[in-house]
Regions:
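Non-catalytic structural scaffold of enzyme domains
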Residues: 1-314
């Protein structure tokens, strides 16, 4: 990969040539976040990179996740992005902080990397990320149930960051190793519903408690929100006698980014076109990736997400 341009971001707010926002995921799940970003920021351009060749990250070691994420971010910076969103919980949990603190200051100090974990933690704790020490949430009580990949659960990042901000909250987690492969393989609804029900049951039985909130800690899982709602109603509703709110990342992260860009307008520019454009990159087989696009981001027009639009990189 070529060395990134370290020049300062374009300071203008509107241009025919915008600084695109980079969105990265280990595979296709990040398309759910991209779709929400496109709807919330319609006049911005986006570059999406899916590292399908190395997916899923949930089964990788920490050093492997860090290095693959670093290379992906570097690629998006080299394409002209000043801001990259890690639309991957595993990458956000394992690689983001090290990238921000150790790599970014020397490689591209004028650029920024954000993750999808922070907005979720802020939402569940009702505390800004940077001000929790002054004003921890002392009164919020209950149990948060988090469903995520093995690597995200193993990192304990959600657990640690939530407990910092809301020490009275209990946090219980459940790894769901079969959900991403099932979605990528387009398994039928009966299969995915059964898998989800099994994981919800495991969470409750293993911890001997039921969650007051469910957090879907993988960008693939919004596609299974209905399945989680049904499983929660069946297993948890029978115990609590009420429904359980389910927090999904796409809309929460999109609203958070919109607010962030109001405070940091120098990082990207809106195009003067009525609609921004999106360019798609993959490290995998472009034809195979195209076939999965319709389930992960149904709002994308087929012509926009066709195989000719997915650019395969080495």
């Amino acid at each position: 990969m070529q060395k990134s341009d370290k020049s300062q971001p374009n300071q203008s707010s509107t241009s025919n040539q915008s600084n695109p926002i980079g969105v990265f995921d280990s595979g296709s799940g990040g398309l759910t976040v991209l779709h929400a970003l496109q709807a919330t920021l319609p006049t911005h351009d986006f570059l999406y990179f899916g590292d399908h060749q190395h997916a899923p990250y949930g089964e990788k070691t920490g050093p492997e996740v860090y290095e693959m994420t670093r290379q992906a971010v570097q690629f998006l910076f080299d394409q002209g992005c000043n801001l990259v969103i890690l639309a991957c919980n595993t990458a956000s949990a394992i690689a983001l902080r090290k990238l921000q603190q150790e790599w970014l200051p020397s490689y591209a100090p004028g650029k920024r990397i954000l993750g999808v974990l922070v907005p979720m933690v802020e939402t569940i704790t009702d505390r800004p990320w940077i001000k929790w020490e002054q004003h921890p949430q002392q009164y919020l009580q209950g149990t948060v149930g988090i469903f995520a990949t093995k690597a995200t659960v193993r990192s304990k990042t959600f657990l640690v960051e939530i407990k910092k901000r809301a020490p009275q909250l209990d946090v219980i987690q459940q790894a769901c190793p079969d959900l991403v492969p099932a979605l990528e393989a387009k398994k039928d609804t009966a299969t995915t519903d059964s898998l989800v029900e099994g994981y919800v049951r495991q969470l409750v039985e293993k911890n001997n408690k039921v969650p007051n909130w469910i957090m879907l800690g993988c960008t693939h899982y919004p596609l299974l929100k209905d399945a989680f709602e049904k499983a929660a109603a069946k297993i948890i509703g029978n115990i609590m006698g009420q429904g359980v709110p389910i927090l999904c990342q796409p809309s929460i992260c999109a609203d958070s980014l919109k607010d962030y860009l109001k405070r940091h307008p120098e990082l990207t520019t809106e195009t003067t076109r009525s609609q921004g454009k999106t360019t798609y990159f993959t490290s995998g087989n472009s034809a195979h990736v195209e076939s999965a696009t319709d389930i992960f981001c149904p709002g994308i027009k087929s012509s926009e997400a066709s195989s000719s639009k997915w650019q395969q990189i080495e």
